[in-house]
Amino acid sequence: MYDVSGRGGVARSVVNLANRLADHRDVRVVSLHRPSARSTYELDPRVSLEVLVDAAAASPLDRLRRRRPTALRPVPAEKHMTRLTDRALRRRLASLEPGVLVSTRPSLHLAAVRWAAPGVRLVGQDHKNFSTRFAGPRQPEVLREAVPRLDAYVVLTHADAEDYHRELPGLTTRVEVIRNALPWAPAEAPAPLASKVVVAAGRLANEKGFGRLLEAFAPVARDHRDWQLHIYGEGPQRGALTEKVRRLGLDDQVRLPGYTDDFRGVLAGAATYAMTSRAEGFPMVLIEALSVGLPLVAMDCPRGPGEIVRDGKNGFLVDDCDIAGFGDALRTLVEDDELRRDCGRQALADSHRYTADAVLADWLTLLDDL
């Protein structure tokens, strides 16, 4: 993976999986970088960590290599991949002993199929949806070379699996659907849902669509002055979102608290979870909301929400980009306490599909079959 110390969903899901696999396998996490000495997500002591590039200990020649883009073509230029990481990756992959290597990004899939030692079984794990991957610069070329040479390719939704088979006719690589697991066990009882707080979370960036959420919430907020919207996270759109809150007259009803170290507690204290992302891979926040019995309102963006939200059962699934429809669904849960509680009970029941044990069983089956 690129960076085990990151705050993002990839780091979280990798650490969760590694920790669970440690009960059954010898596990090592190999991180290209580790810019922060303190990781957001804690590895089990039985999981060994190896960092390939130590920026602090770089020689003058290594610093020069770090400024030059990767030679691993057709990987596009990106900050994580440089001549320095090329050198470290090639050496480490060539020295691997027989076992299973799981790579987490298209560029790492390509490095694995080109440079891994003989006898290593190769599994690619994708944390983004097919449409996003194939829209990126040069990524289709990378995937068209790498995926057919992998032993298995793990995607997050059935729709993504179908897309890969359609895009790569005759593909013999085993394409497996394995969802990300909950980082904690489901609650014993649903949240009380009495707080009159709608919660959302994610990077404050365009792809998360929080501007759409503010527009959908505004008419509901005008009719229900005792309800609030709390959007957790940080990112480049904080200023723009703050200004939009002001323009919509929502200063007293919308908060942007930043990051929280107790996201489960935040969810358990809310009444509804809202998602208006423009694209997702498999949104962890939705299954985390399910796990405390929180009803969902989500736009059916590509991909993920459509395979998690059961419309009218554990919440409401709204057509992508339908801001008015999203506001109507939100209003329904705000105004109907009994429906909100019914959806919350179903949400908690549905969360058991994503427990660590359920997802671990899928991974162990795959690893045993390779």
Where are these regions (language model features)?
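N-terminal strand-loop element at the rim of the active site
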Residues: M1-R7, R20, H24-P76
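Short His-centered aromatic/hydrophobic patch
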Residues: T82-T85, S103-H109, D126
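Carbohydrate-associated surface elements
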Residues: A159, A181
